[in-house]
């Protein structure tokens, strides 16, 4: 099953997490609390700097988000790894949206730079993913650059985010 809308709300993202959006055994988002965005506001396969696709997603920030209570007591900040994971989640979603089969796994990245922290006073985080390449074979591999902005200021820059979809019948499986 292929779902090619240009935007997705929170209920759609939860359906993806349950394996209902792209079909059982295919690309899924994690369910809360690890789902790191509330909506995908734009997704297409022709936009972005490289003309290969772009994804925009948003997270509404409030002081009650689960990670602020434990990271760190008295100095709450969103863990940087969660923002990075959100970018990997979006690349995997793009692969499923593009018709790729099999469950997804983050495979690495080339470079990551942090220049700010998401604290409870932030109102909105916006993720922008610029797809650079999609390789389609038994393994679907997506390579993209991404940014995470908080209230309009870019805090994270990632280069060469890599995510693969591994068909169940493929000979190559990710190391666990």
From Swiss-Prot:
CDD domains: FabA (cd01287). The active site is at 71. It catalyses: a (3R)-hydroxyacyl-[ACP] = a (2E)-enoyl-[ACP] + H2O; (3R)-hydroxydecanoyl-[ACP] = (2E)-decenoyl-[ACP] + H2O; (2E)-decenoyl-[ACP] = (3Z)-decenoyl-[ACP]. Homodimer. The lineage of its organism: Bacteria, Pseudomonadati, Pseudomonadota, Alphaproteobacteria, Hyphomicrobiales. Its main location: cytoplasm. GO terms for molecular function: (3R)-hydroxyacyl-[acyl-carrier-protein] dehydratase activity; trans-2-decenoyl-acyl-carrier-protein isomerase activity. NCBIfam families: fabA, PRK05174.1. This is 3-hydroxydecanoyl-[acyl-carrier-protein] dehydratase. It is found in: Cytoplasm. It comes from the Bacteria. Its EC number is 4.2.1.59, 5.3.3.14.
